[in-house]
Design a protein with these regions (language model features):
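Enzyme catalytic cores with a strong preference for nitrogen-chemistry domains
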Residues: 1-339
């Protein structure tokens, strides 16, 4: 469960500029090496040796800063106008069937004013808290409104059927660019039960509110939104740089949908955003992150936050996303050089 790797601490620091070259693990290695150099410097009795260790430490940090000045990507078209809709639906009401109409109405009311001034409108993970087959009239009406306005909707929704008992945590595209994506990397005990044959007996005993999803295939058709190919991830998938790399080099920008309401008012939603920022930096792509209760944000290819919403408020976060093409060394080679 690689949630808080050491490298994430350097997103806003010079060593973070190594992420496009060696990923989060390479950045973590540089942190450890820096600490070792500093300890050796402070504990060396020979002043000449101290100068040598200081020079090596300075070379590492200045080298990282210099590598960050190299551009590996370039624009792949005009900027897209993006609206991220944060519904702020409380967890106790999210899956309540009696609250479904209220939830859908909230998202529609927040989105309608954005249709005339957006290329893409993004809703969070399972923003539509019902199976796709159960809300097809609503989705069809939303698609008609989107096509008339010339906008794409991207939203999280569970898909599957009770007949087959196969369900997916999914993203659908509604409007000009219909699309479907099934989450590949599921959260253990939250979205599926590991070792089902051995552990199923205690699921009710521990009383964990869980879903029972099936992972999507490793090879899925590339999603499009705003006329550009986009790399998708859902919640926990943003923790894995290897998952983000799957959509490259074709994807010119990234979307991450999440529901961090489970974490409530803890450090975890902010940590999740920090993780997503480093993903954008690793592969040199803008990232639009839509969450139910925050923290929703637009992040540029340098991992910098360009727009950000508050927590625990219904809000629309507006901004521009610049599609980019090109491959960073990390996007090309992955984690293996650092590991």
């Amino acid at each position: 469960f690689p949630w808080l790797a050491l490298g994430y601490s350097q997103t806003d620091a010079p060593l973070g500029q190594l992420a496009p070259y060696a990923g989060v693990f390479g950045v973590g290695w540089a942190v450890v090496f820096s600490a070792g150099l500093l300890w050796t410097l402070l504990n060396s009795a020979d002043w000449r040796a101290r100068l040598g260790w200081l020079g090596l430490l300075a070379a590492l940090w200045l080298g990282a800063w210099g590598l960050g000045r190299i551009a590996w990507v370039e624009p792949a078209g005009p900027a897209l106008r993006v609206a991220i809709v944060q519904g702020n639906v409380t967890q106790d009401r999210k899956w309540n069937p009696d609250a479904l109409d209220e939830t859908l109405t909230r998202y529609v009311q927040l989105s309608l004013p954005e249709q005339s001034q957006s290329d893409v409108i993004i809703w969070p993970e399972t923003a539509i808290p019902a199976l796709l087959d159960e809300v097809r009239p609503f989705v069809a009406a939303l698609a008609g409104a989107a096509q008339q306005a010339g906008v794409d909707y991207v939203t999280g929704i569970p898909t599957g059927s009770w007949e087959t008992s196969i369900f997916h945590n999914s993203i659908i595209g509604v409007g000009r660019s219909p699309g479907l994506y099934h989450k590949r990397r599921l959260l253990p005990f939250g979205e599926y039960l590991p070792l089902r044959g051995l552990l199923l007996f205690f699921r009710d005993w521990v009383d964990i509110p869980m879903a029972d999803f099936t992972p999507g295939g490793l090879e899925q058709p590339l999603f499009r939104a705003g006329g550009q190919p986009v790399g998708l991830s859902i919640c926990f998938e943003a923790v894995f740089g290897s998952e983000i790399r799957r959509a490259l080099p074709e994807a010119t920008w990234l979307i991450n949908l999440s529901n961090d309401a489970w974490f409530k008012d803890s450090a975890a939603p902010h940590q999740h955003l920090q993780i997503a920022r480093l993903r954008a930096l690793e592969v040199g792509r803008y990232l639009a992150r839509a969450t139910n209760t925050g923290v929703s944000a637009i992040v540029d290819e340098q991992g910098r936050i360009k727009a950000r919403g508050p927590q625990f408020q219904a809000e629309v976060i507006r901004g521009e996303v610049q599609p980019l093409r090109g491959l960073t060394p990390y996007a090309r080679f992955g984690d293996w050089p650092a590991v």
